[in-house]
Amino acid sequence: MSKTLQSIRGMHDVLPADTPAWQWLEAAARELLAGYGYEEIRMPIVEQTELFARSIGEVTDIVEKEMYTFEDRNGDSLTLRPEGTAGCVRAGIEHGLLHNQQQRLWYMGPMFRHERPQKGRYRQFHQIGVETFGMDGPDIDAELIILTARLWRVLGLKDVRLEINSLGSTEARAAYRALLVQHFEAHAEVLDEDARRRLHSNPLRILDSKNPAMREVIRSAPSLLDHLDEASRAHFEGLKALLTAAGIEFTVNPALVRGLDYYCRTVFEWITESLGAQGTVCAGGRYDGLVEQLGGRATPAAGFAMGLERLLALVEAGGARPPAPKPHAYLALAGEGTQAEGLRLAESLRDALPGLRLVVNGGGGGFKAQIKRADRSGADLALIIGESELAEGTILVKPLREAGGEQQAVPRDGLAEFLRARIG
């Protein structure tokens, strides 16, 4: 007996019973983003490995441990994208979208990281990413946050809270980095292996550690907010004022640093406790140096990404899972000549009634078996064509969801109007 093949660990099939919820979420996001003037961009899921090493940072968990990297037949090192911002910036530079232009872009699709699979965390996961270019002020940071807050309302999410921070300029961060190294070196005995590894390469990431044994040394660390440059401080105060004016509640978290090296100034996360352990459902910030870092001209930029699996889990935890759409009608056919007539009728109904969900019986079978299939499909009506209906030019309509509903013969040329009245 041959081995049964299964999906790769951490990579899941989305089955027909679940796809309506995905489609509903995706449609809500599409409509909202269009309303704010954002345009869709689609990038490859495979990029040169160098793109992520240069953008995310070589001394990060993603690049060091989590990327799916392989060598193609030409000897080039390629990587399945672990996030979308770097690819979006690469596309913007390559196609001339960014020079002296403002852009509001978004994308949707799978990302890949070789992490330990757990609740809300997968090796193939899906994100909606939003990126803005050419806008330097705190107003665009506020717009991104306000946009996500509106999406939470559209989706009926309540158990999410916003944390914000500022990482300052590159120069201010370098000076703060030296202070941080000095602080952690003085408490080296409590640092875990991961923190010691990061101490001289990426000390800000130590602030993001979840190790309870390091909680006190992290809490007592100097705050980056106390060492911001004046421009970054003014930018952050402007953002806080705009969010307050918009009625957006937030908490300033000085330990919020984000896991990607390209962030500067504003960073933010939307967090929930509704999925068990604290989880981030949306995160972003500014990355003003990334376009130049990847070979373009200096361009201010900001964006965010949200995980669809986590959002769907939140929606379902709140009891708001959208119902799966069911067929309006199921067409049952039995007898000589009925299949050809049934296919012609189905197409004429689809022409007359855009949006009609009509399933035509396939694979034959008697009327009894077909009506059982119709019932299992969830259709409201069974449309029946037998040899007698074919000869008389009628369709027998049988209600499937009405207690005591009586079947009736409807003339073929009046069926479209009959269905329009039933389905609206």
UniProtKB/Swiss-Prot annotation:
GO annotation terms (biological process): histidyl-tRNA aminoacylation
Entry EC no(s): 6.1.1.21
Keywords per UniProt: Aminoacyl-tRNA synthetase, ATP-binding, Cytoplasm, Ligase, Nucleotide-binding, Protein biosynthesis
Recorded GO CC terms: cytoplasm
PROSITE patterns for this protein: AA_TRNA_LIGASE_II
Coiled coil feature spans: none
Catalytic activity: tRNA(His) + L-histidine + ATP = L-histidyl-tRNA(His) + AMP + diphosphate + H(+)
Gene Ontology molecular function: ATP binding; histidine-tRNA ligase activity
Localisation: Cytoplasm
HAMAP family given in the database record: His_tRNA_synth
Binding partners and assembly: Homodimer.
Recorded family membership: Belongs to the class-II aminoacyl-tRNA synthetase family.
Name of protein: Histidine--tRNA ligase
Organism: Thioalkalivibrio sulfidiphilus (strain HL-EbGR7)
Gene: hisS
